[in-house]
Design a protein with these regions (language model features):
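Cytosolic regulatory regions of ion transport systems
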Residues: 1-251
């Protein structure tokens, strides 16, 4: 479920990234918007080819969400517009409505105001990004190290190359009575096993900042997820036995 069409170019860019996503490229898409660019009454053909259904209606209305079969969706993506900051509030309320009625649906949204991010957890919203923070942060990094944007573009696109991932499985699910181990020993084990990953850090909870490049002596907790770079998603749970065995030999 995709909510809002801030512009056709942005929406098509989102469709392109979804086409590259192994998790979402084969899932039918429903587009919901209260209005279209240029006050169009119908979506153009180049966009209609990328979706299954388009529903014109107020996304924050429960009736509209039911027409869109929101309860059957795997996820809902909300897009925002810098020219309409109030859309952040509407998106937050709509995403909160989905979480209240269908908590199994993954909800993520872009925020034109950075302060909106702080409200997402209150409504049970699963994730969000601040377009303003990203833009300003990248601008200064590009100033300090020209070319950093190309690195970011490589990592943030689903079209190929390397991406940043967060492991689906928690460290504690890798095995019963697993002894605690350090971040450094995990990196050494991954290197010696020639795993196709570059371990960057850990993520404790969705609402916390990830711990990137921590000290090697940091002990991983059972609820921690691995933040890593790879060309495709790595099956940590499926490879956990040999990883733990290698770590055991190191200690």
């Amino acid at each position: 479920l995709i909510v809002n069409v801030p512009s056709y170019s942005e929406t098509m860019e989102l469709m392109k990234e979804l086409d590259y996503s192994p998790d979402y490229k084969h899932i039918p898409r429903v587009l919901v918007a209260s209005h279209l660019p240029n006050n169009d009454r119908e979506i153009p053909s180049f966009l209609s080819q990328k979706i299954g259904t388009f529903i014109m209606g107020l996304p924050s209305a429960l009736e509209t969400l039911e027409r869109a079969n929101a309860g059957q969706a795997k996820a809902c993506v909300f897009t925002s517009a810098a020219s309409d900051p109030a859309l952040d509030d509407t998106n937050t309320l709509t995403a909160g409505l989905i979480e209240k009625n269908w908590p199994q649906v993954i909800t993520v949204m872009t925020c034109s105001r950075s302060e909106t991010l702080g409200n997402l957890s209150t409504f049970g919203i699963d994730g969000g990004i601040s377009t303003t923070d990203l833009q300003m942060g990248l601008l200064v990094q590009e100033l300090e190290d020209p070319g950093i944007y190309k690195v970011y573009s490589e990592l943030s696109s689903n079209s190929g190359g390397n991406q940043i991932y967060i492991s689906h499985s928690k460290v504690g699910s890798w095995g019963e009575n697993t002894q605690s181990f350090s971040f450094g020993s995990l990196k050494i084990a991954a290197t010696q096993l020639n795993l196709p990953v570059e371990i960057l850090g850990i993520q404790k909870t969705t609402n916390e900042k990830p711990v990137l490049n921590p000290e090697n002596k940091l002990l991983l907790g059972s609820a921690d997820h691995i933040v890593y770079m790879a060309r495709k998603r790595f099956d940590w749970l499926g490879n956990s036995s040999k990883i733990l065995e290698k770590i055991k030999k190191l200690t």
